[in-house]
Amino acid sequence: MKGVCTRKVLYFFMAVILFVAIVASEDTENRNPAMAMPLQRMEQEVEKVSSRCGPVACPGRFCGSDLGACRPPWCCRGCSCSFCCKL
């Protein structure tokens, strides 16, 4: 009988800890919206960059040999390498 009672108390505390962990994680997401929807923010960034890219924004020049350079089939606008566009 004592073992059953101890097990019930243990399960109760485990449930309380789980509940507190779930509530705390939801609260963290609400406080930091940047962490709540990183995928949506990434999609917006890709859309923003792709709207600037294309034949008009890409003069077809490829930046030089430095490590951060755009390489074919990517070109950089004005050869500044601020962002790379796919031809």
Swiss-Prot record:
Annotated localization = Secreted
Q: In which tissues is it expressed?
A: Expressed by the venom gland. Not found in the whole body.
Keyword Disulfide bond annotated: yes
**What keywords is this UniProt entry annotated with?**
Disulfide bond, Ion channel impairing toxin, Knottin, Neurotoxin, Potassium channel impairing toxin, Secreted, Signal, Toxin, Voltage-gated potassium channel impairing toxin, Voltage-gated sodium channel impairing toxin
Posttranslational mods: Contains 5 disulfide bonds.
Q: Which residues belong to the propeptide?
A: 26-45
Q: Where is the signal peptide?
A: 1-25
Q: Which domain of life is it from?
A: Eukaryota
Family the UniProt entry places it in: Belongs to the xibalbin-2 family.
Domain comment (free text): The presence of a 'disulfide through disulfide knot' structurally defines this protein as a knottin.
The protein's name: Xibalbin-2
Species of the source: Xibalbanus tulumensis (Blind cave remipede)
